[in-house]
Amino acid sequence: FPILNKEYTGLRNKLDWIKEMQANAALTVHHNIEEYSEYTGIPFHRIMWSANQKVFKDYGEGYTSDLFFSGVTRPEQTENLRERVLSEMSRLSDYKLEINARSHRNNYAGTIYSDEDYAKKLASSKICFITTGPSDLVGTRYFEVMSGNKSLILCNRMNEVVYGDMLIDGYNCVMFSTVDEFFDKAEYYLNNEEERMKIVNTAHTVFKDRLTWLNRSKEIKSIIEGYRE
């Protein structure tokens, strides 16, 4: 049961390797499981990340920033959406922002947080700006924010194929399609605390109920056991 990883680089070689080993099945966090299955002739199953609840939690401290972003910007990623949003952050000049962006513009310089420091950043920010990664991968940050139960996920809008039932706009996150919509929604939820926290709390409940590492391990176990029957 090989696990396909970093699907955005050397994908064809990785799929060929899985095809040659004639595995019973393969696992991946990417949503293109039908395409991978068709190419290799091997069943692919989608699994997913989670978060360490002992680290990504409510630390019992107040908020120190209104909006937080930490990550790399890549021109080829989601039509350079991160860079396009970050370049207009002056539109939120009345709010306290904490931005740790690394890109080709600054030779990818920036702070690399420890897990605990990073978790505390999430727990002290009212909104966390997140987008899908290379090849539209759903990364760990979505689950880390939900686990923390303090910050609102403000993320790029993707279809159900990508997000599945893990992320639902207006329910456990807030989605945007354009730069203008990002800023409209950021301001709205920074000025409507009750509505912001309603979504934050729902996200935490969803996480605890079905997105923890225990849930993930049970899902993987079930997949493997299905091939032993």
Language model features with spans:
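Nucleotide-sugar donor-binding catalytic core of glycosyltransferases
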Residues: P2-F143, S147, S151-D165, W213-L214, ...
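Hydrophobic, well-ordered secondary-structure elements that form the walls
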Residues: V145, C173, A203
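Glycine-centered loop/turn motifs
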Residues: D169-G170
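Conserved acidic donor-binding segment of nucleotide-sugar-dependent glycosyltransferases
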Residues: C173-V179, Y188-E193
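Catalytic phosphate/metal-binding cores of nucleic-acid and nucleotide-processing enzymes, i.e., regions
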Residues: F182
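A charged, aromatic-enriched C-terminal amphipathic alpha-helix characteristic of glycosyltransferases
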Residues: L190-I224
